[in-house]
């Protein structure tokens, strides 16, 4: 679906309906609970797509790419491959610290990760919006 508030609203309704019927949600949510996002926010991710020469001409654009927003749901038969948490926004990078907005099995959290956190900091440096992240909150 398009990564718009309306696209997310429709997916959220479908999510609630499928979960009520016993479906197993695999992604992007790391849990089967109700979505913890407030009604004025929406879960969306970004994918960079290459533009053809014709596409650039039609759009009057100079950049050879376009950042497309989307939202999605993935269901499966078992929860064995479900992420522990998911990065919801682009990480905020500061000197010696990275702040992540995560959806975890226990809800939404803002996680500051410092250099002294070792392997967690290394994972945070590589993290992008939409990635699974190895943190149980």
For every predicted segment, state its role.
Residues 5, 32, 79-81:
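Short, solvent-exposed loop/turn segments at secondary-structure junctions
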Residues 1-6, 24-28:
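Conserved beta-strand signature within the Rossmann-like core of class I S-adenosyl-L-methionine
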């Amino acid at each position: 679906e398009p990564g718009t508030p309306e696209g997310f609203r429709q997916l959220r309704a479908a999510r609630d309906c499928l979960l009520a019927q016993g479906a197993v949600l695999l992604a992007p949510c790391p849990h089967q609970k109700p979505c913890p996002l407030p009604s004025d926010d929406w879960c969306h991710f970004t994918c960079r797509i290459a533009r053809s020469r014709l596409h650039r001409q039609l759009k009057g654009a100079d950049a050879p790419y376009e950042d497309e927003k989307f939202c999605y749901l993935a269901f499966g038969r078992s929860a064995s491959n479900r992420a522990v948490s998911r990065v919801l926004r682009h990480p905020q990078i500061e000197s010696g610290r990275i702040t992540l907005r995560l959806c975890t099995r226990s809800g939404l959290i803002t996680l500051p990760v410092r250099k002294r956190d070792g392997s967690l900091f290394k994972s945070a440096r590589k993290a992008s919006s939409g990635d699974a992240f190895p943190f149980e909150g």
